[in-house]
Amino acid sequence: MVRVIAVSNPRLAQAFVDYMTTQGIELRVHNTGEAAEIWLADDSHLEQVQHELQQFLIDPLNSRYRAASWQAGNTDADLHYQGFSYLQTLRSKAGPLTLGVMALCIVVYILMQILGDDTLMYWLSWPQDSSQYLQLWRWVSHAFLHFSLLHITFNLLWWWYLGGPLEKRLGSGKLFVLAVVSAFFSGWAQSLFSGALFGGLSGVVYALMGYCWLSGERAPERGLMLPRGLMVFSVLWLVAGYFDILGMSIANAAHVAGLVLGLLMAFWDTRHRAHNEQ
């Protein structure tokens, strides 16, 4: 049995379970009092369930979900849909650390628009010389700097999509360690090529991509996954950055370092399971 997700609205959980029943996949709802947990009996269907869940959370009011509830005989499954919102979707998939980092990045971005990039870079950028080495926040705070609306939107969507489930399943501590370590090493790698003039959460995002993808491949029961198609796209995007065909400045070294680190951490965390299967 694999826990797929926990949601605050039990009617919503039942609607998704009913829909997956029409797809030939058995899910169960367990009410804990604080949330409704959805569990998957056969983990070989985990990737399909995760994909369908993403579509469901984007548009839970879609008629196909209501139709599935009627077909399954749960005709009251849609009575409380009006209480669901995009904010609830955001919160249901993310823990406090995921949401906190998103809020911090947004605040820093707004301040950069008001005070200018240079002001925030002065306080948050990667250490420029040895005199700043003891300003310990600089080793990770560069990840909160974003230089365009597209930059911050792209990174925060990926951070929420990958970091939220990781925090929900493995805890805030695991996400914190992965984020801090990947911010440090991706920043160090990028500084070798561009000095201290860089910023963004993309090094951490690539670490999450590597971690979630390899964890899903080696230990699907952990409940983490990244579809192979998205992983291929991410690697192609990384490669495209080296050929300057995207027409924008990209921290390529940070991306590579983050991806490699995420893969290594996932390999280490799943080593015992792989050993036990041999």
UniProtKB/Swiss-Prot annotation:
Residues annotated as transmembrane: 95-115, 143-163, 170-190, 192-212, 224-241, 245-267
Statement: the UniProt record of this protein carries the keyword rRNA processing: no
Gene behind this protein: glpG
Catalytic activity reported: Cleaves type-1 transmembrane domains using a catalytic dyad composed of serine and histidine that are contributed by different transmembrane domains
GO molecular function: serine-type endopeptidase activity
Name of the protein this chain belongs to: Rhomboid protease GlpG
Classification via InterPro entries: GlpG_N_sf (IPR038236), Peptidase_S54_GlpG_N (IPR022732), Peptidase_S54_rhomboid_dom (IPR022764), Rhomboid-like_sf (IPR035952), Rhomboid_protease_GlpG (IPR023662)
Gene Ontology terms describing biological process: proteolysis
Subcellular location: Cell inner membrane
Recorded topology in the membrane: Multi-pass membrane protein
Protein EC: 3.4.21.105
Main function: Rhomboid-type serine protease that catalyzes intramembrane proteolysis.
Organism: Serratia proteamaculans (strain 568)
UniProt family annotation: Belongs to the peptidase S54 family.
A Gene Ontology cellular-component term: plasma membrane
Catalytic class of the enzyme: hydrolase
